[in-house]
Amino acid sequence: MRKFIPVFLLSVFVLGACSSWNKTATGTAAGAGAGAALGAVIGGLIGHDGKSAAIGAAIGTAVGGGAGALIGRKMDKKAEELAALNAKVETVTDANGLEAIKVTFDNGILFATNKATLSAQSQKELKEFAAKMADMPDTDVTVYGHTDNTGSAEVNEKLSTQRANAVAGYLQSCGIASSRIKAEGKSYTMPVADNATKEGRAQNRRVEVYVSANEKMIQAAENGTLK
């Protein structure tokens, strides 16, 4: 039986072997949080240095606890399915205070050093991810590319953007609509570990894929029709 580890991030870190997914918040609590802060950016991606970026689009209206619970259960179920990937899957909180999913891919698996061309293995992993997302068209997918702090900010900004775009483009080719996908390079501005060590730099070289409820899913949850 998998144990849930509290986190406040929304990513999946691909390791050498299949990893478990980690639950961070229940749908009820997340929905209640959104209701308490109208349209506030509550959730996000929080780096080692404390910087953060919101995940998903804030809809500007309160989301009730009941709707949050429905979305939470749907995200839990999908996270369990995604756990079959060669990845670590976590549930986190998005910009509306709702449960979302984070998938983080190690750049060492996705790309060759200083390259932005997807490897055959990474294409296989991303194709499997896209296939498992086919039954959730009412979600948004956000892709962030990250690097360590080796090299100039300009070089790392370009590389992280190219890698994020490569992942987003491949997911589109696998059937995820371009209207659902956002890609952005973060360079080394949001580390999750200490760049002073080799191990820390390895953790910081990653691509994160975030899955969050879009307005259509939220509306269905509010109406009680979300399945």
Segments predicted by a language model, with ranges:
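Sec-dependent signal peptide recognition
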Residues: R2-L10, L38
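C-terminal motif of bacterial Sec signal peptides marking the signal peptidase cleavage site
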Residues: V14-A17
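Short, low-complexity, glycine-enriched hydrophobic/amphipathic alpha-helices that associate
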Residues: S19-E81
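Stable alpha-helical elements in mature extracytoplasmic
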Residues: A37-L38, K74, K78, S122-E125, ...
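Amphipathic, membrane-active segments
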Residues: K74-K102, E222
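Envelope-exposed proteins and targeting segments
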Residues: G97-I101, F105-N107, N114, P137-T139, ...
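Periplasmic peptidoglycan-binding/anchoring modules of Gram-negative envelope and division proteins
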Residues: L110-Y144, Q172, V209, K216-K227
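Periplasmic OmpA-like peptidoglycan-binding domain that tethers envelope proteins to the cell wall
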Residues: H146-A220
